[in-house]
């Protein structure tokens, strides 16, 4: 649906909603205690009865009470809470938050790695009439201070002493709304208004059930429940206000479109919960369907994730592209150790897997005997080695997945479905599922939502605009930014560019703010160029196109290297794939330093050949890469070039490597 008529239809749909309210609310608000007009459809998907989060949770507890909900590892043993226990713990936490002085529509901040305590505090905050405010564990003290004051955080949950010290380093006068801090991991040092988790959970004993019920009953589906702070890759983080209805409606929509089954799903929680994608798939969807959530170890992103996957065998797995790329590299490394028949079988199976799954993607379900053999001999073993042998939904989100990785997994019978969404759309807006996906597409629009491509060019590329029950309430205390995002007819303008094919599959081509405009006035979207560079030159880990307002395009390149498993810092040593690339050229280099300091002629020549191949596919001379430089370290969360969800922070990179960029232009 790419035309504007849908705008009018969407606007008419609103007439059915909130008709009991004396003053009809608007589609947006910037007030923490504000109410919005819900975007209910007249009938069908999108017309479901609005629910508050307490109603939503209570309904699930009635259906799944004794089923396992949360699993936390204590030593070698998994400790399980069922849905009854989970709900009671949330009520207990809510009473304690009230006792500590949580005010209505004020924040409860959560700073730490995923855990049962994170979930219980998040839900408890909402039951108690506050707002759940996730804070990235990687945030600086300055960003934490901004979020705490902006969200009016009354109570803060921190994981450990390291996070506590970060907060204590902030002058107390700059943390005015904060009344108490709870720490949920030992050891713990004594401090004023600091509580251990166990002590905190006992604080609310004197609060009667009736008092909590009054707060719960006073809540409305069109009021704010969750604040998601954008990671601030381009400036000050914005507080995205999500209503009860945003959360409860989209949890149901995702469940239906992913074809998830009640009481049968298992997920592993490891991505930062302050990001809406992780929060939706780890907290809210499992409540909706009675799924079991296992908590990964805190060092999951540094190497232990696959061990957890092998132990718990999730049925649904969501990863960001860099996670899938790491797993891709691991499988390739292991397969390279195979010899003789085993190696031949792997190549044979991949060829069959790619052909069969490519046809399946187009709706042709032909499974020859050779495919069934490949499944038994190779695919099942690869999946078992990754802990994905029970998994039916393989998902990638937050950034585009590169083609090589997508095709590699497709050939191994692991079709990765990409999704597209924003914090402002409460998570996914389009999804791919096992029966409905295309390589490099973000899938189709969620049932009950609407899409519009605004100001399309001759190629059908336009700004992706969104409509539905999942559209956020507004940015907290920021009317200007809210009205820039939501137009007069209620469409959310994403700032992302995309196109739709004839079947309704969405392809995201870039971001309006990321488009480079050269000194000659040429518009160049960087992502397609960067993706092609990584495809043509296998030793390249990250590529960032530079050239805004400059006379030609240049590129920052990083090489694939090993990572420090404890800190996540990129090491100097090249990884397995990069070393293989070098040996194939006849280079004996084993470190980034050897290649960069000596300007290894074999590697530099191969990179230039790759750049030449990319330039041959350029639409015109203005889109050609004229110069490039290899940086001494790969991009990472540790170095600040990547955000918490491993998204490239272009503005930060441009500042950090200004000297190298300037050198290419002077």
Curated annotation (Swiss-Prot):
Q: Which CDD domains is this protein grouped with? A: ACSBG_like
Q: How does it sit in the membrane?
A: Peripheral membrane protein
| Taxonomy, superkingdom | Eukaryota
Which is one Gene Ontology cellular component term of this protein? cytoplasm
Tissue-by-tissue expression = Testis-specific.
Which PROSITE patterns does the annotation name?
Answer: AMP_BINDING
Q: Name one GO molecular function term.
A: fatty acyl-CoA hydrolase activity
Instruction: Name the Gene3D superfamilies on file.
Output: N-terminal domain of ligase-like
E.C. designation(s): 6.2.1.3, 6.2.1.15
Show the InterPro entries listed in the entry: AMP-binding_CS (IPR020845), AMP-dep_synth/lig_dom (IPR000873), ANL_N_sf (IPR042099)
Q: Name one Pfam family in it.
A: AMP-binding_C_3
Known catalysed reaction(s)? a long-chain fatty acid + ATP + CoA = a long-chain fatty acyl-CoA + AMP + diphosphate; (5Z,8Z,11Z,14Z)-eicosatetraenoate + ATP + CoA = (5Z,8Z,11Z,14Z)-eicosatetraenoyl-CoA + AMP + diphosphate; hexadecanoate + ATP + CoA = hexadecanoyl-CoA + AMP + diphosphate; (9Z)-octadecenoate + ATP + CoA = (9Z)-octadecenoyl-CoA + AMP + diphosphate
Q: What class of enzyme is it?
A: ligase
- Which terms are listed as keywords in the entry? ATP-binding, Cytoplasm, Developmental protein, Differentiation, Fatty acid metabolism, Ligase, Lipid metabolism, Membrane, Nucleotide-binding, Spermatogenesis
Compartment annotation: Cytoplasm; Membrane
Q: Where does ATP bind?
A: 230-238, 418-423, 496, 624
List, in alphabetical order, the GO biological process terms annotated in this UniProt record: cell differentiation; fatty acid metabolic process; long-chain fatty acid biosynthetic process; long-chain fatty-acyl-CoA biosynthetic process; spermatogenesis
Which purpose does this protein serve, as stated in its record? Catalyzes the conversion of fatty acids such as long chain and very long-chain fatty acids to their active form acyl-CoAs for both synthesis of cellular lipids, and degradation via beta-oxidation. Can activate diverse saturated, monosaturated and polyunsaturated fatty acids. Has increased ability to activate oleic and linoleic acid. May play a role in spermatogenesis.
Family statement: Belongs to the ATP-dependent AMP-binding enzyme family. Bubblegum subfamily.
Protein name according to UniProt? Long-chain-fatty-acid--CoA ligase ACSBG2
Q: Could you tell me which species this protein originates from?
A: Homo sapiens
Q: Which gene encodes it?
A: ACSBG2
């Amino acid at each position: 649906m790419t035309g504007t008529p849908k705008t009018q239809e969407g606007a008419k749909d609103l007439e059915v909603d909130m008709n009991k309210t004396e003053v009809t609310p608007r589609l947006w608000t910037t007030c923490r205690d504000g109410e919005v007009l819900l975007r209910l459809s007249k009938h069908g998907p999108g017309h479901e009865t609005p629910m508050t989060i307490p109603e939503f949770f209570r309904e699930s507890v009635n259906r799944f009470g004794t089923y396992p909900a949360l699993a936390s590892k204590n030593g070698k043993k998994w400790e399980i809470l069922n849905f009854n226990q989970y709900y009671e713990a949330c009520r207990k936490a809510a009473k304690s938050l009230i006792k500590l002085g949580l005010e209505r529509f004020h924040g409860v901040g959560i700073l730490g790695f995923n855990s049962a305590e994170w979930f219980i505090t998040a839900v408890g905050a909402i039951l108690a009439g506050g707002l759940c405010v996730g804070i990235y564990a990687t945030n600086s003290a300055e960003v934490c201070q901004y979020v705490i004051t902006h969200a009016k955080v009354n109570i803060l949950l921190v994981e450990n002493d390291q996070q506590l010290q970060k907060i204590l380093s902030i002058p107390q006068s700059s943390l005015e709304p904060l009344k108490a801090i709870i720490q949920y991991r030992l050891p713990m040092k004594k401090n004023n208004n600091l509580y251990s988790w166990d002590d905190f959970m006992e604080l609310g004993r004197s609060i009667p059930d009736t008092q909590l019920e009054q707060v719960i009953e006073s809540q409305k589906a069109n009021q704010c429940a969750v604040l998601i702070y954008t990671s601030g890759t381009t400036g000050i983080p914005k507080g995205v206000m999500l209503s009860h209805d945003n959360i409860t409606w989209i949890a149901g929509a995702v469940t239906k479109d992913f074809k998830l089954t009640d009481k049968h799903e298992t997920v592993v929680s490891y991505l930062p919960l302050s990001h809406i994608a992780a929060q939706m798939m780890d907290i809210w969807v499992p409540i909706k369907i009675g799924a079991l959530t296992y908590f990964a170890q805190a060092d999951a992103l540094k190497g232990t994730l696959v061990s957890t996957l092998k132990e718990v065998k999730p049925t649904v797995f969501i990863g960001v592209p860099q996670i899938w790329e790491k797993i891709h590299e691991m499988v390739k490394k292991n397969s390279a150790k195979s010899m003789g028949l085993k190696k031949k079988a792997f190549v044979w199976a991949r060829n069959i897997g790619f052909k069969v799954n490519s046809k399946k993607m187009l709706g042709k379900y032909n499974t020859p005997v050779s495919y069934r053999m490949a499944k038994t001999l190779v695919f099942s073993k690869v999946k078992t080695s990754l802990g994905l042998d029970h998994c039916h939904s393989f998902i990638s989100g937050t950034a585009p997945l590169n083609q090589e990785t997508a095709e590699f997994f497709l050939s191994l019978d692991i079709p990765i479905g990409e999704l597209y969404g924003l914090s402002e759309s409460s998570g996914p807006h389009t999804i791919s599922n096992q029966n409905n996906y295309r390589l490099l597409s973000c899938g189709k629009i969620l049932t009950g939502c609407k899409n519009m491509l605004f100001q399309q060019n001759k190629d059908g590329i336009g700004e992706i605009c969104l409509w539905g029950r999942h559209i956020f309430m507004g940015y907290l205390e920021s009317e200007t930014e809210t009205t820039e995002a939501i137009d007069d007819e209620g469409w959310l303008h994403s700032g992302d560019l995309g196109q739709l094919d004839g079947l309704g599959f969405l392809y995201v081509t870039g971001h309006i703010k990321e488009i480079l405009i050269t000194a000659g006035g040429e518009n160049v979207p960087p992502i397609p160029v960067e993706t092609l560079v990584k495809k043509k030159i296998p030793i390249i880990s990250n590529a960032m196109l530079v050239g805004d307002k400059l006379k030609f395009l240049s590129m920052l390149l990083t090489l694939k290297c090993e990572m420090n498993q404890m800190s996540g810092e990129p090491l100097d040593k090249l990884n397995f794939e990069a070393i293989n690339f070098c040996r194939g050229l006849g280079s004996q280099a084993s470190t980034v330093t050897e290649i960069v300091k000596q300007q290894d002629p074999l590697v530099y020549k191969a990179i230039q050949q790759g750049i030449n191949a990319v330039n041959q596919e350029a639409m015109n001379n203005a889109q050609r890469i004229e110069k490039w430089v290899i940086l001494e370290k790969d991009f990472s969360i540790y170095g600040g070039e990547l955000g918490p969800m491993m998204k490239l922070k272009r503005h930060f990179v441009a500042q950090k490597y200004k000297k190298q960029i300037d050198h290419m232009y002077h």
